[in-house]
Amino acid sequence: MAYPFQLGLQDATSPIMEELLHFHDHTLMIVFLISSLVLYIISLMLTTKLTHTSTMDAQEVETVWTILPAIILISIALPSLRILYMMDEINNPSLTVKTMGHQWYWSYEYTDYEDLNFDSYMIPTQELKPGELRLLEVDNRVVLPMEMTIRMLVSSEDVLHSWAVPSLGLKTDAIPGRLNQTTLMATRPGLYYGQCSEICGSNHSFMPIVLEMVPLPYFEAWSTLMM
């Protein structure tokens, strides 16, 4: 989860989020180098009155500043496209969970089980226990097995919502009448917090998401208890 005054992104807990962090650093370094070069050229132009006559109308220079930006854009686009394809690829999921957005709560259905479904509401501030997080705790957490490929089917019953868990690199729009899908796999156990990331009405800020990633034996015991 995020902390006050945090400068970077949340710690990656899925292969997709690790790729996104690498891409962020890669792109940020390119932007830093370009910005430094531009500032250096501007400072030279402001501090000297000399004119380089050989570059006033040079075909070679024009060729360079046409080809070089194209190479830079390609170096940014290729890793981005690779990650986009990885995010859309779903191979043999071990579990499928359907989540529906409502004003203003989430409902979940484990489609591989006959009768395993529940609603997930935010716990009001006055009912929080010591150590629990304001506006982020829910009455029913989504318990999932770690280190397994899980397919999430996301839709909405009323208006536009967005199901997002930043530390897992997830953000999928919940659109009425349309079923979107995404995949997740956590590399370590723990609680992962998210929120609705699409303004959906007056209580938009009160639609938290809590995923509890556990080892497979614990998940099997939980699913048996819930049914």
Curated annotation (Swiss-Prot):
Keywords: Copper, Electron transport, Magnesium, Membrane, Metal-binding, Mitochondrion, Mitochondrion inner membrane, Phosphoprotein, Respiratory chain, Translocase, Transmembrane, Transmembrane helix, Transport
Enzyme Commission number(s) of this protein: 7.1.1.9
PROSITE patterns given in the database record: COX2 (PS00078), COX2_CUA (PS50857), COX2_TM (PS50999)
Catalyzed reactions per annotation: 4 Fe(II)-[cytochrome c] + O2 + 8 H(+)(in) = 4 Fe(III)-[cytochrome c] + 2 H2O + 4 H(+)(out)
Binding, Cu cation A2: C196, E198, C200, H204
Main location: mitochondrion
Stored Gene3D superfamilies: 1.10.287.90, Cupredoxins - blue copper proteins
Residues where Mg(2+) binds: E198
Binding site for Cu cation A1: H161, C196, C200, M207
Key word Translocase present: yes
Task performed by this protein: Component of the cytochrome c oxidase, the last enzyme in the mitochondrial electron transport chain which drives oxidative phosphorylation. The respiratory chain contains 3 multisubunit complexes succinate dehydrogenase (complex II, CII), ubiquinol-cytochrome c oxidoreductase (cytochrome b-c1 complex, complex III, CIII) and cytochrome c oxidase (complex IV, CIV), that cooperate to transfer electrons derived from NADH and succinate to molecular oxygen, creating an electrochemical gradient over the inner membrane that drives transmembrane transport and the ATP synthase.
Subunit field text: Component of the cytochrome c oxidase (complex IV, CIV), a multisubunit enzyme composed of 14 subunits. The complex is composed of a catalytic core of 3 subunits MT-CO1, MT-CO2 and MT-CO3, encoded in the mitochondrial DNA, and 11 supernumerary subunits COX4I, COX5A, COX5B, COX6A, COX6B, COX6C, COX7A, COX7B, COX7C, COX8 and NDUFA4, which are encoded in the nuclear genome.
Protein name per its UniProtKB record: Cytochrome c oxidase subunit 2
Biological source species: Lycaon pictus (African wild dog)
